[in-house]
């Protein structure tokens, strides 16, 4: 039981510290596990921390601390190493105590009260509902879901939230794209725009409109194109050509709203609801669930955006220039000031984003975690600035960035897009490699590091595939327990002192690390640390399984080994559950 051992070691060191340096008893004592197991089970740099205050060599202080260390059955060896570290080797009996703790606590092994059940909101994915989720969204979804489960496991009251960007121009473009495909299917000759949404899903939504409403929304091409500025040559890609296409697109949207009248709302909402439902289904199938789906449009409907901008003005953080209202974001470290309300009276996306954060804080969360794509790095300063300008505590907001995942096939970078120029979808990736490989491979790197996703490795059933390797360890334990055929409850009385060979003690030490791994991963918002740990634990188990017989003739030793194996299975299951990966009983 790592926490109890660390508590006991800390108490021993505190007694020694009181004798060696009575004036420095408030010095924090840090205990870490050495990377090299030959250096013992725990190490402390306490002597090096004291060196400046005591004006002594750290090794001299370390030896003095050892001399004053009270005797304890916990420690079989304590020695000075390197520049002044103190390394501790634990008694084997204390190492194997963790096995009983794992079996007794079961699914709760590793849980902590780190968060004190404070309220934390984790907002993630939040992709525009303008098309299918792609592999980039998938990494954010896997990270957010794993982080949410991790924080819950570590004692936080977690709310998982998806911010639905259902207001603004992108939704108008989706509605227009659907209507243009509908007109196309009814023989109306209106050119489809290169800057509209191109995917087959748009055609599918248009067909649904035809099935439900026939030709109700058909309008003459001349009326649809009336007053539009026209399009530049298709091959042009300069800024002016882009501007012309955008003007043409906006003119078509304006015409659609006039020509369809109230029916524009239907077209708009049909496209939104279809894409939102598709994304929700995709995520549910991926094992990613949300407690709240928060509508951006609701911020406008309730007047919160206007109230938020007015509050910024009241606090002296806005100015008017060329008819627009600007937020003084440079005051808070941003590279330039930002428009929150244009000269035509329309609010910017930034304005609604500020209002959304005001809403988060007004809901009383103790911590707010935003999971954003790495391309939003420059957005952090202005959002933090706006929160501060509203008179709120910006330190409650934490932003975790997620880098894009790059797919590899046959050792070569795979195409990330389809023939229509759209990214490979999350659903396609899941269909190829499966949910488990997706969830685990997405968790194999720190979220803000680039991820190379090896499709061939993810599909392989070899020890090189980490998810297979860990699941296989779990399945092997299940096989051992089935062959043993006993009652798991009886393992509480197993004689764990018989687990005395180096491989068994190494596994026990690794099991004892799990609590610390959970604690550190939760503090650092780093579920990848659990993936690393599980790979190591599976490696320790496979090495033991291949070297030793589990079901030996000696009943006492057999039960002890089955107990250790069962503890490995439980710990793997607890870790994989956090990561959203299944643990099959057989493979």
Swiss-Prot record:
Q: Which PANTHER family would you find in this protein's record?
A: ARGININE--TRNA LIGASE, CYTOPLASMIC, ARGINYL-TRNA SYNTHETASE
| Position of sequence motif 'HIGH' region | 127-137
Q: Name one GO biological process term.
A: arginyl-tRNA aminoacylation
Q: For this protein, what reaction is catalysed?
A: tRNA(Arg) + L-arginine + ATP = L-arginyl-tRNA(Arg) + AMP + diphosphate
Per the record, the similarity remark reads:
Belongs to the class-I aminoacyl-tRNA synthetase family.
InterPro entries per UniProt: aa-tRNA-synth_I_CS, Arg-tRNA-ligase, Arg-tRNA-synth_N, Arg-tRNA-synth_N_sf, ArgRS_core, DALR_anticod-bd, Rossmann-like_a/b/a_fold, tRNAsynth_Ia_anticodon-bd
State one Pfam family annotation: tRNA-synt_1d
Which keywords does UniProt give here? Aminoacyl-tRNA synthetase, ATP-binding, Cytoplasm, Ligase, Nucleotide-binding, Protein biosynthesis
Which top EC class is given?
Answer: ligase
Compartments it resides in: Cytoplasm
Q: Which HAMAP family match?
A: Arg_tRNA_synth (MF_00123)
Q: How does it assemble?
A: Monomer.
What parts of the sequence cross the membrane?
Answer: none
- Record keywords: Ligase included? yes
SUPFAM superfamilies hit by this protein: Anticodon-binding domain of a subclass of class I aminoacyl-tRNA synthetases (SSF47323), Arginyl-tRNA synthetase (ArgRS), N-terminal 'additional' domain (SSF55190), Nucleotidylyl transferase (SSF52374)
Principal location listed in the UniProt entry: cytoplasm
Q: Give GO cellular component annotations, separated by semicolons.
A: cytoplasm
- Supply the name of the protein: Arginine--tRNA ligase
Which Gene Ontology molecular-function terms are recorded? arginine-tRNA ligase activity; ATP binding
Instruction: Report the domain of life of the source organism.
Output: Bacteria
